[in-house]
Structure formats: C-alpha cells, structure tokens
C-alpha cells in the first residue's frame, strides 16, 4: 500500500450535528454502500450505527470503523459518538487517527461537545478540517460559525468555500481555490456539476478568497511576498501551502448538507488533499525499561511490528480487537507479544472492518487500522513482534462521576449479569464494577446517566437479564481545608516483641481533586526514623485515603510532610510504622476541618426561546449557577454549572418542561465544596444506610 495515499480520519462533533449522516454519504459516494439509509425512522438505520440501540435512539454509541477508497486514496474512517457520556470512545479513536473532520451545525455552531472534542484533538495534536453541516436549515449562518471557531476554540479558521443559496434554497458551494461553483445533481447528489460562479456572488467570492490567502500567508513567506507585491498566487502553490497550513494547525472550513446530499464530495477531496498521511505524523513509543526514554517509530513495513489495541468489542464469535499499526507488518498466523502482560499471542484471523461486516485479510502494514479476532487484551495495550520493544503511551481516561446499584430480578441470572458487566468493563475503561463492602450491592459507575442506562439496556437485550436498578449515587470526595501538625505514637506491648512507631509532621491541604492527588514528602534528618521504614509510613497514609472519616468517601487534595519521629531497636518494624500512619490519619484528619467535595457538571441546555424562563428557574432551583445564555433564531442556549446530585432524571424533566423540544449535554467541570447544610444531609444519609446495612 502506498502510504502517501492512506488517510486515517475521524469524524467528530457535538450530538445531532449530522455526523453519522455525513459518514453514510461518504460511504455512498465512495461506492462502499449502494443505498443511503437515514439515522432515524424507517429502513435499516445508518450503516455505521450497527448496535440495535443506536438505530433506535439515533445516536452513535461506539465508534464504528470502516475503510473506503476515493480518487485512489485508501481512507480508514472512524465515526465517533457525539454524546458526552461516550467521551472515552472519542479519546480512543483520536489516539489512533492522523486527521479529523470536525462537524458543526450551521445553526448551533460551536456547542459544548465541540469544545470537548476540540480539547481532545489538541491533546493528540490532530490536524483537522471543519465541515459546517445542515446548510439547508432555517437560520444557517456559516460566517457566524467561523467566528465561533476563532473565538471559542481559538482556531485559525477560514472559509475554503462560500455557499450558493441559503437555507431551503441552498444549492451548492463556491470553491475559493479553483474559483468555480459546484452544484449537486442526480437522485442522491452523486453528480457534481462544475459551473461558473453566479454573478451575484462574484464579489463575495473574491473577498473570501483574499481572506483565505491572507490566512495562508501566515504559513508561507512565499505567499506573503506575492500578496505584498500584489502578484497572482498560483493554484498549485495554494494547494501546497494549504496542506502545510493544515498540518501546522490551520482549520479550513467546508460546508454542505449531508442529509440533502450536497457538499460531501468536495469535503472528501479536501480530506485526501490536506489531511496527513501516516508518513506526515511523528509517533513516539516509550522504552519499557526506561519510561523517560522515547523511541521514534517509523511507518516502515520491514521494521519490527508495533501496534496499539484501541478498542475491544465482544461479539458472538469472540473478542474483536481494533488495532492501529504504527510500524512493521503483521501476518496472519504469526505470534506477537502484548507488552503489558508479556503474553505471546497468535493472530489467527485479521479482518478489515466495514461497520460490523468484515473482510478477511492475510497481512497489514504500517498506517493501517484493522481488527484481530480472538486475542485476549485490554484497551490501550501495545503489541510488538519482540518483548520489551516499546509501549505507546496510554490514552487519557476520565474518572467516573456516577454510580448505581444493579441486581438481577431473577436470582438465577446472577452469573449472566456478572459476565455482561465484566465484558463491558473490558470494552470501556470509564465503566467500572465493584461490590460495596457495607451493603454487598453490586455497583456500576460511569460518565453519566445515559452511559449507564445504555449498559443496563444492553444487559437486557444481549443477555436476556432483567435488572433492578437502584437510585443513582454521587461520587463525593473528602478534603482537608486547614493545615495541622501531628505527633503520633503507636505502642503495643504483647507477649514477646511489641510494636513501636512514632511520627511527627504536617498534614497540608493542596488544590487537587483527582483520586491520586496525594503528596508525601519525607524531611526526617539524622536517621530519627530509619530509611527502611519511610515507605511503610507513606503506604499507611496512602492506603487509608480510600475511605475518609467524614462519610467514607475517598480523600483528595492532601499532602503529608514527615518531619521527625523515633523508633525502637527491637519493637519497631514496617508493620508498626504502617499502623502508626493509619492511626495518625484517623486522629488528625478530623482536626483539618475536612469538607465534602461534590462533582459540579458543566451543562449546556438548548431550548426554544419561550421556555427560557421556566428552564432557567429550574436550573437555579437545582443549586445551579448560570454562566451564560444566548438566544439566536428562536433558540436559547443556556450554559450553567449544576451539582451532579441535582441532575438525576433531568432528561425527563427537561422534556416535560419544553414539550419534548429541549436537549442538553453535560460533563464534569470540577469538584467543589458542598454547602454545609447539604453536607449534613449527606452524612446523615450515609449513617442511615450503614444502620440499614448492619441490620
């Protein structure tokens, strides 16, 4: 395969921007499917949405992967979910892509999930194009969307096309490089007709072209000089500089209406012209024997194989592992080593995926995205042809914010349910399962109500198990707010040798809410505590952080400075110092004025203007803090920060407040102190649960 002609791209966006519809048209125009299906309503549902639930709800839950050919280019296309509860799917697919298309709605513009996706693209330094979809909608305003790209995302965005006609009269686009008009004919827009720019758009097109060249001049001294001397910039130069600009962070903007079959083919051309091939990306692995040491990987088919498992799906035929190959070649029947588990596994079946259909292949080389059947691994694992060759850094996985108790209605279904939960846990790192020690309930936790609802629904459908679901529970945290000095002795005299440990130091609050935000610093001088006991002190403190003294929630934002202490030649041991650290924490943490922290969600609500007052009042009643509201073309977008505890059941409430016309998304913004009256309620509730559990 000629690597220059390979593109690994993702299609990312806010929910309901028409992303899956766009993917569907790309499959159709590249000849991969012969009939267009719509996302909602009758028919078979979109090709990329292959899970029953996705077809019903009209949202994309898991990233489907498929490959298409366009103008001699091989494009691996990943359709990612737009709903914030499925963010990890987006993280996973971006990690293995070389480029992306950010889809925006011509009316909604840059919405909360577009901002999240943008942040993820920046994290993985992914060059991208923007596509303004739904140009046929009332209120379509592409220039406003470009402004928002600049202001809200800080993107260097500029128009590469302008629209011909507006709203229901949208007919096509003007290409600002070729300076021609493209309109779309045939039953399904498959015929692209090139014509002259309509007379009434000539001036606007000239202006937009000047603005585009002006933006490109920031990436090329040559273009800058030609513009300054008022000379013509050749088309070849514009194409070349446009590609350099995209690889260096520029975002050219294309437009169309995927649903009305307009504007998709020019976008596909731009994908092949400007987005990077695997040869354009620098990829580094890490040396397993030295984490600090980077290893440059090259897309060379003859070098040792390095690939990353970025998605795992269990299907009736066993585990299906999606993999991106960064270096070397994999061959059917050969064995490769999982760098984490050090297990060697035979790749007996390699397939190229088209949504859930699969084509068997014998080998695959660098830059390709394929799936391997029947290997046992976890998402994020690196495979190589040799042991300890390289690991690819793992993906960023956000911490879960909501948990609920689940029980099978029929006792005999316990095994089936636990099999399903273990499978989902393997597929999705943001989904976890554990047993509550006090109540013995099975708890599942995830990124939001919809996230967990979908899994419960999948257990019902795929495993035939009816589930009883408890009320959602919030993952609170406990945190100190005042510095305290401690001086703690642990003495125990039993028959034979006793236990003795003495520690002195400070417990200091620090700004952080992640579960691993514990700092430990040892400043003991003169061997007052022998070096071999220090790790036991740190471990004692670290191990007790899982359950804080206020209400048994994890403790965060804590720093321990160990300053002094004493020991006994006979009675001191690692165990004694470990126990001392735990006893010290129990006694002194209460003196540090500990507070409960609660997850605060950043919520974006979109409602028809006439419901604005009702919805705003409801947000305030939920202890919400309004950050902005913006009304445009009869729709109001409200941004607010609301405690997670107050959002349960919000989807239903919003539907009834807005006659089914309101939509919302939310994601974790931060952990903040809980008001004292709420804190007292939570503690009382915990005590009640404990008493109930003890009975």
Curated annotation (Swiss-Prot):
The keyword Transcription does not apply. It is found in: Cytoplasm. PROSITE patterns: G_TR_2 (PS51722). GO terms for cellular component: cytoplasm. Pfam families: EF-G_D2, EFG_C, EFG_III, EFG_IV, GTP_EFTU. Keywords: Cytoplasm, Elongation factor, GTP-binding, Nucleotide-binding, Protein biosynthesis. Residues 4-279 form the tr-type G domain. InterPro entries: EF-G-like_DII, EFG_II, EFG_III, EFG_III/V, EFG_IV, EFG_V, EFG_V-like, P-loop_NTPase. GTP binds at residues 13-20, 79-83, 133-136. The keyword Nucleotidyltransferase does not apply. It comes from the Bacteria. One of its GO terms (molecular function) is translation elongation factor activity. Belongs to the TRAFAC class translation factor GTPase superfamily. Classic translation factor GTPase family. EF-G/EF-2 subfamily. Catalyzes the GTP-dependent ribosomal translocation step during translation elongation. During this step, the ribosome changes from the pre-translocational (PRE) to the post-translocational (POST) state as the newly formed A-site-bound peptidyl-tRNA and P-site-bound deacylated tRNA move to the P and E sites, respectively. Catalyzes the coordinated movement of the two tRNA molecules, the mRNA and conformational changes in the ribosome. This is Elongation factor G. It comes from Rhodopirellula baltica (strain DSM 10527 / NCIMB 13988 / SH1). The gene is fusA.
């Amino acid at each position: 395969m000629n690597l220059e002609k390979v593109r690994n791209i993702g299609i990312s966006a806010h929910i309901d921007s028409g992303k899956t519809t766009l993917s569907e048209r790309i499959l159709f125009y590249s000849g991969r499917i012969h009939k267009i299906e719509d996302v909602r309503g009758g028919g078979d549902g979109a090709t990329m949405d292959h899970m029953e639930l996705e077809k019903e709800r009209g949202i994309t839950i898991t990233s489907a992967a498929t490959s298409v050919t366009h103008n001699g280019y091989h494009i691996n296309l990943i359709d990612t979910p737009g709903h914030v509860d499925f963010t990890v799917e987006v993280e996973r697919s971006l990690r293995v892509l070389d480029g992306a298309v950010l889809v925006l709605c011509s009316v909604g513009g840059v919405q909360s999930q577009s901002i999240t996706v943008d942040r993820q693209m920046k994290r993985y330094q992914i060059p991208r194009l923007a596509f303004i979809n739904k140009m046929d909608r009332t209120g379509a305003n592409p220039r406003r969307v470009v402004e928002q790209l600049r202001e809200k995302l800080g993107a260097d965005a500029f128009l590469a096309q302008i629209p011909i006609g507006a709203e229901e009269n949208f007919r096509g686009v003007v290409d600002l490089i070729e300076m021609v008009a493209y309109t779309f004919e045939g039953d399904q827009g498959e015929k692209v007709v090139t014509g002259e720019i309509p007379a009434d758009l000539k001036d606007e097109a000239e202006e937009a072209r000047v603005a585009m060249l002006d933006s490109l001049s920031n990436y090329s001294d040559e273009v800058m000089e030609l513009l300054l001397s008022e000379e013509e910039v050749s088309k070849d130069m514009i194409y070349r500089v446009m590609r350099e600009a995209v690889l260096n962070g520029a975002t050219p903007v294309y437009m169309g209406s995927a649903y009305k079959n307009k504007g998709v083919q020019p976008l596909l051309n731009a994908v092949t012209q400007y987005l990077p091939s695997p040869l354009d990306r620098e990829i580094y692995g890490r040396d397993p024997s030295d984490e600090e040491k980077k290893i440059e990987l090259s897309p060379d088919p003859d070098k040792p194989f390095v690939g990353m498992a970025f998605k795992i799906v269990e299907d009736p035929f066993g585990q299906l592992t999606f993999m991106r190959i960064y270096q070397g070649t994999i061959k059917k029947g050969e064995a490769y080593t999982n760098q984490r588990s050090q297990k060697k596994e035979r790749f007996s079946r390699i397939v190229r995926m088209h949504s859930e259909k699969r084509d068997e292949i014998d080998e695959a080389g660098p830059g390709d995205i394929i799936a391997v059947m029947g290997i046992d691994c976890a998402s994020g694992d690196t495979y190589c042809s040799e042991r300890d060759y390289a690991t690819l850094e793992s993906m960023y996985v956000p911490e879960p914010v909501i948990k609920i108790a689940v029980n099978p209605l029929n006792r005999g279904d316990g095994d089936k349910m636990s099999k399903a939960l273990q499978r989902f846990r393997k597929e999705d790192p943001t989904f976890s399962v554990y047993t509550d020690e006090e109540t013995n309930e099975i708890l599942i936790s995830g990124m939001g109500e919809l996230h967990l609802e979908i899994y419960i629904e999948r257990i019902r459908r795929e495993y035939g198990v009816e589930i009883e679901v408890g009320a959602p529970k919030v993952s609170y945290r406990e945190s100190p707010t005042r510095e305290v000095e401690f001086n703690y002795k642990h003495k125990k005299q039993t028959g034979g040798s006793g236990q003795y440990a003495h520690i002195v130091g400070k417990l200091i609050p620090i700004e952080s809410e992640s579960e691993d935000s514990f700092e430990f610093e040892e400043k003991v001088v003169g061997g007052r505590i022998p070096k071999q006991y220090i790790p036991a002190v740190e471990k004692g403190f670290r191990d007790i952080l899982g359950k804080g003294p206020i209400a048994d929630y994890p403790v965060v934002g804590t720093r321990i400075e160990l300053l002094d202490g004493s020991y006994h030649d006979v009675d001191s041991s690692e165990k004694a110092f470990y126990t001392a650290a735990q006893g010290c924490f129990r006694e002194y943490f209460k003196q540090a004025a500990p507070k409960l922290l609660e997850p605060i969600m950043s919520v974006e609500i979109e409602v028809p203007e006439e419901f604005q007052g009702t919805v705003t009042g409801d947000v305030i009643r939920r202890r919400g803090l309004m950050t902005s509201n913006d009304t445009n073309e009869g729709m109001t977008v409200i941004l607010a920060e609301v405690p997670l505890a107050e959002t349960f059941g919000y989807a239903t409430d919003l539907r009834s407040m807005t006659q089914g016309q309101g939509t919302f998304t939310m994601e974790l913004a931060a952990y903040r102190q809980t008001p004292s009256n709420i804190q007292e309620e939570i503690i009382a509730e915990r005590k009640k649960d404990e008493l109930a559990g003890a009975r």
